[in-house]
């Protein structure tokens, strides 16, 4: 059952990348990213309002717990990490072929595995090590094929941006574990819906500020 869910998730992520690429063609990155965060926040806004003003979501999966500054400071940091990853990722996707972006983005789980070893002291099994080796091999082969298309991994700034996005995405995954783990296990113990809902809201606010300061004043130049 979980394997089927993983394949469905991978399929939707594939469509997501294709639609992102199409949206970025002949469009500026910042307004597209703002609209992405805006519509994402609209999805979770009703859950926040219903949870705080009614009892209809009490004891349900969609209930958003009330949080103070202690909880929200961690969520704000998560929004900064994720949004930074998205900005670098969107910029690189606009300038690179999707056949190059997809495989490099697929190395993020490998980065998370390595990060889990370094940060949380976890151990990889044989199959996970095989996955790490295959991911590194695929990057090497991508660098070779990229040269044939005129894309040099060591001299292309868009590739550099893409790797920054992947690293920040992996950091976000490791940070999620810290946020969700109970205090007894060294984490913060935040509610999943609290994090998911409010981090989308904060992302939208950050992007609104970035759009107003960086894009709107120069959009006609």
PLM segments and residue spans:
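Membrane-interface interhelical linkers
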Residues: 1-20, 25-30, 34-96, 144-163, ...
